[in-house]
């Protein structure tokens, strides 16, 4: 899936070490806005140390923070293991590029 929007800000970042592999991990949450008569907002996650750094570099390198971007992402539903029968969605982005309206 993809969305044209404005990348507003990094809202949360988590890091740690995998208990099984010992590798470092990172997960960032970003906020985007789709302008219009009824402005829409979406929060999504970017995973992986390298990918998170790429997104931060992309955002920091944008001279105009109101430039539209194209974000490609996946949505997936997961069942809550603590409460069977309850589900939640994850939105994970994997690509970003500057675009135009």
Cite the ranges covered by each PLM segment:
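Single-stranded nucleic acid-binding surfaces, predominantly the OB-fold ssDNA-binding core
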Residues: 1-101
